Each structure stands twice: as structure tokens, then as C-alpha cells.
């Protein structure tokens, strides 16, 4: 007689398999856990071989849609459930995979393009961060440095957290980042941000070069969650609407889009962003519809007076 296993019974086994067998990063594991726990919270911790599991999945997706989740976010959760039920099926915990007939929503090109800030938005944030009537806390200097680093280096939030003092080369003007798969890359930094980093370090009572650059008042490394929360505080105090999407990753997209608009070659941008494939970087070329339109107007024969 088969045991009546619940959805949650194999969650830990699934996450261990993802980490050990597939080498998923801690952030990916956390995302899987979050999505599966969200699923259980909405549909209940029902039996994994429930004959209405496919209907439960569709109910879950409808709840997400009604709550305003984006198609991209819903697609991620579908991918998570698909992976989990495939794991259960391969290990013969379930006889059929309920995700077989569940399709991901179609995402239009404009929905899949990276979100980025206009230059005036970046200027507004940097100017506001230096306004002591808006930002008066001891964290204000950290906020300012954090935003400049995100925009200047286009680092992922985890990469930003992992910068150590020794990774900053003041003489040559670059920072060493550790990206996905612990791959290292060197990214240039503007002079003003370098001076700000030096001032930030000098303000510490004592330090050594192995310490992290961004730390809290207890000299502990900042976590991605802390930086994400800081950015939301900055967004609110700068007066942006709730609908405006501003996250650490948006600054990465913003820096990349602005560099591309200024004429940076895709291969150079790929090196800065740490993309293993140039196809990932090419999406920033699609973002620049303004430049594309200008080139079109200049070069297409139909825009000449002769036709």
C-alpha cells in the first residue's frame, strides 16, 4: 500500500538534489524554496498524487495572476513546479506528472526587456542622496556609495556584497568581482566613485584588506536582502511612485543600457556584465529603440526625398 505523502514531504530532498547534483547557487535554492512554500500556502499541503493536482496548480496560477504577478514571475513559478514534480516522477513518488499539460504564459518582447531608469531618474536619486533634509541617518553615506557602485560596476547584488577592500585597485581604477560559478572579472570604476570608496574606508576606525567593503555598524558583511531593503527605502524617500520598479538589479540594467546607448560594443559590455553568452547581452541592443530609430531614419532609402 502506497504511503500518503504530502507535497512538503520531499521538499528538502528536492532542494538537496538541486544543490548537490545540479550545482544550483544558494540564491536559486532559496527561490525554489520560496516558490514551493508559496504553492503549499495557497493550495494546501495536499497529497502529491492527488487526482486534482493539475486543477490545484491552475488555481495557484490564477491566484497569482489575480494578485498582479507578472507573466515572467508566473513563468518562474511554473518552472519551479515543473522541476519539482519531474523530480517526484523520476523517483517514482508519483505516477503522473501534473505539469505535463501546464503551459507558461507567452511573454511579449517588450515585457521581457530589462527594466531600466532614465538618466534623469539616476540623477534624481544621486542628488537626493546628498540632500541632508531627506537622508539624515548614519546610513546615508552607505546608501550613496551603494547606488554609485551598482550603477558604475553593474554588479549583481550578491557580487556587490562579496567585494572585499583588497578587490579595489585605486591605482588602475577597477574592482574585481566574483560572479556566477565563482568566476572572477575586472570592471572599471569612475574616479568619483573610487574617491568615495577611499573616503568610506578611511572613515573606519580600523580595517584590514580582507574585510568586506560594505558592512553594517557591527562590521558584518551586508546581505543581498539588506541592500534590497535599502534600495526600497531610497526609492520611497526620493519620491518615486509605488509602481516604479527600482531594485539593485535595475541599476545593473540601467548602467548596461546607458553604456550601449553611448555606443559601447556588445563584446565589451559582455565582459563588464560577466555574461557567458553574447546573446544574453544583445537584449540591451533591443532596449535602445531610440538609437535604432535614429539609425533607421538616417539610412533607410524611404526616408530620402527621392522616394
Label every PLM stretch briefly:
Residues 1-307:
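Conserved catalytic core of the tyrosine transesterase superfamily
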